[in-house]
Amino acid sequence: MSAFQPTIKRRESTKIYVGNVPIGGDAPIAVQSMTNTRTTDVEATVAQIKSLERVGADIVRVSVPTMDAAEAFKQIKQQVNVPLVADIHFDYRIALKVAEYGVDCLRINPGNIGREDRVRAVVDCARDKNIPIRIGVNAGSLEKDLQEKYGEPTPEALLESALRHVEILDRLNFDQFKVSVKASDVFLAVESYRLLAKAIKQPLHLGITEAGGARAGAVKSAVGLGMLLAEGIGDTLRVSLAADPVEEIKVGFDILKSLRIRSRGINFIACPTCSRQEFDVIGTVNALEQRLEDIITPMDVSIIGCVVNGPGEALVSDLGVTGGNKKSGYYLDGERQKERFDNEDIVNQLEAKIRAKVARQDPKNRII
């Protein structure tokens, strides 16, 4: 890794806890996702949550639209370890029910669950059980009067919506909450978060909502979340993809890794290849990404197909391979080794070297 390390000054915020996961303050930025199974299908939902746990999800959100789903949530909660957020709209009784069942966070908007006595019931319950709340404002469901006032979703409109809900919790003397102001438009979301970051001290949950499929959604999320994170804004994030939720976690960590905010697993530095490549770089990278998904130890591995950029990248990597005629150069901790890799067997040889280096480090934190 390059010695150049720009300083990102993190926005100051209060700290809350979602289960045992701290959010805000000096806590690491948490990565989360949301299940897309039917919540009433307990077996499928538990299986998906466990798959998210395996790739590093800090928190998982589950939609709880009905009382039947709330009963299913009870069974789900008993079978998983990761903190669960219940996503609830309109019916305050569902929030009270999942609170009985050990929910770790309630995603509600106080303004859309009815009369103040209902809001107070939910807030009092959350306070008694030490359950935080997430206020989630979305450009696609902006209040009708704000749409009429502003003509369309604007940063000011999203901010006003968020502050309405914040005011309700303030009035009830409840401060254990985080807030999101999501939009599918990158610039709208980014500016909304900038305004919100100046207006409140609570932690911010980042997201570019409904970002799209795996490729386009990852790009939009990387651009939008990257802009905010580089400014020190954000305490937890979700990458919203029309894809397997597991990909949301992987992309989320890749964004944090790219900004050197939080690293998990292998960071591959690989060339796009040209006619100078001496071995199959693309195939090597694809194979190693799959084989090494179990490793959580942060590590930079450079895989470069020729000697133009290979040695330079290897010098600042934990491990590196530089393409050569029939055999390729091998670097460890920035130093060239006498050993060379057979170009036909680079995947196996490099995997073995990576796993050996991981094994020499903290054994408690090397693999899933």
Curated annotation (Swiss-Prot):
Binds 1 [4Fe-4S] cluster. InterPro entries: Dihydropteroate_synth-like_sf, IspG_bac, IspG_bac-typ, NO2/SO3_Rdtase_4Fe4S_sf. GO terms for molecular function: 4 iron, 4 sulfur cluster binding; 4-hydroxy-3-methylbut-2-en-1-yl diphosphate synthase activity (ferredoxin); 4-hydroxy-3-methylbut-2-enyl-diphosphate synthase activity (flavodoxin); iron ion binding. The keyword Membrane does not apply. Converts 2C-methyl-D-erythritol 2,4-cyclodiphosphate (ME-2,4cPP) into 1-hydroxy-2-methyl-2-(E)-butenyl 4-diphosphate. The keyword Iron-sulfur applies. Its EC number is 1.17.7.3. It comes from Haemophilus influenzae (strain ATCC 51907 / DSM 11121 / KW20 / Rd). It is an enzyme of class 1 (oxidoreductase). Its cofactor is [4Fe-4S] cluster. Belongs to the IspG family. Pathway: Isoprenoid biosynthesis; isopentenyl diphosphate biosynthesis via DXP pathway; isopentenyl diphosphate from 1-deoxy-D-xylulose 5-phosphate: step 5/6. Keywords: 4Fe-4S, Iron, Iron-sulfur, Isoprene biosynthesis, Metal-binding, Oxidoreductase. One of its GO terms (biological process) is isopentenyl diphosphate biosynthetic process, methylerythritol 4-phosphate pathway. It catalyses: (2E)-4-hydroxy-3-methylbut-2-enyl diphosphate + oxidized [flavodoxin] + H2O + 2 H(+) = 2-C-methyl-D-erythritol 2,4-cyclic diphosphate + reduced [flavodoxin]. [4Fe-4S] cluster binds at C271, C274, C306, E313. This is 4-hydroxy-3-methylbut-2-en-1-yl diphosphate synthase (flavodoxin). It holds the Pfam family GcpE.
